[in-house]
Curated annotation (Swiss-Prot):
Gene name of the record: rdgC
Purpose of the protein: May be involved in recombination.
GO cellular component, as recorded: bacterial nucleoid; cytoplasm
The name this protein goes by in its record: Recombination-associated protein RdgC
Keywords: Cytoplasm, DNA recombination
Subcellular location: Cytoplasm, Nucleoid
Length: 302
């Protein structure tokens, strides 16, 4: 259990989470109904089989998991059946069904197919840092992250979380780092970047598995390309790719952090998950605080 991507939001640190244990059962994921397309709700971070514990809290860190059940009903299947049904009607009546009747037929087909459709189960994890007021959602999709925030908002009744933004140009900052400007302490360049022309629709250059301080990169900078994604390493603990959208992708925890698991008491799966969450949360906080000042990240009003 380690997050692989981070989409970040800020929320006021004055929010009260003291009742989280008592209200979570009311927002538990229920099975998707026979005639429903989707169902969402909270599940245990420790797996769907766990019915009692619907969150995990360690100090200022809160771990929530939103589970989903989605019916798989391909549009191609529905459209094929609709075409066949409309052809049968045309043969009987001598003319194709009109738009309104066609819509009714399609709705009837979906109603008929839904109870037999396969169900896809998924989960998205989120870590809330109650001390510093940010949410790290384990996805690179803004839409999926907003779904998690919406579930938390429904749970609490109010959750004024806003997408993370910066007061400076992230592209300009990333470009300056790759051009040789000093990076924040403990950060080093990785071996991957994406560069774009400043003009809309311009060329995009992607570099992987290479040194980023080199003549080839310098030539792209000289003609005005800017860095839109940049691989970075936090000590020997965390590697990641920071985008100009402030989404952290390809998050990977390295030996410097993982070695600490060998010295922790992880007797059993639950204890190991607890230890992993504690270490991961601490590293995400360290990374967030390290980036907060140079990138002038937004704060939420308390």
């Amino acid at each position: 259990m380690f997050f692989r991507n981070l989409t970040l939001f800020r929320f006021p640190t004055s929010l009260d989470f003291s009742q989280i244990d008592s209200i979570l059962p009311n927002a538990r994921l229920r099975p998707v109904g026979p005639l429903e397309m989707t169902s969402r709700g909270f599940i245990s971070p420790f797996g769907r089989e766990e019915q009692e514990v619907l969150n995990q809290r360690q100090g200022d860190f809160l771990w929530l998991t939103v589970g989903s059940e989605d019916k798989i009903l391909p549009a191609s299947v529905v459209n094929d059946l609709l075409t066949r049904k409309c052809s049968e009607i045309e043969e009987k009546k001598g003319h194709p069904p009109g738009g309104r009747e066609r819509k009714r037929i399609k709705d009837d087909l979906i109603h008929e197919l839904l109870p037999r459709a396969f169900v896809k189960k998924s989960r998205i994890d989120a870590m809330l840092d109650l001390r510093y007021g940010y949410v790290a959602v384990d996805t690179a999709s803004r839409k999926a992250a907003e779904t998690v925030i919406s579930e938390i908002r429904d749970l609490l009744g109010s959750f004024p979380a806003l997408p993370l933004n910066a007061e400076i140009s992230i592209r300009s900052m990333l470009t300056s780092w790759i051009a040789g400007e000093p990076l924040p302490e403990h950060l080093n360049l990785g071996d991957e970047c994406e560069m774009k022309d400043a003009t809309e629709g311009g060329a995009i250059i992607k570099c992987q598995h290479q040194a980023l301080r080199c003549e080839e990169i310098d030539k792209h900078l000289e003609v005005g390309k800017q860095v839109s994604k940049l691989a970075l390493i936090l000590d020997d603990h965390v590697s990641f790719v920071l985008g100009d959208d402030l989404v952290i992708r390809k998050l990977k925890f390295l030996d410097g952090m993982l070695d600490q698991l060998e010295h922790s008491d992880t007797d059993g799966i639950r204890a190991e998950l607890d230890a992993r969450f504690a270490l991961m949360s601490a590293e995400i906080r360290r990374l967030f605080l390290l980036l907060e000042v140079p990138l002038k990240l937004s704060k939420a009003n308390n």
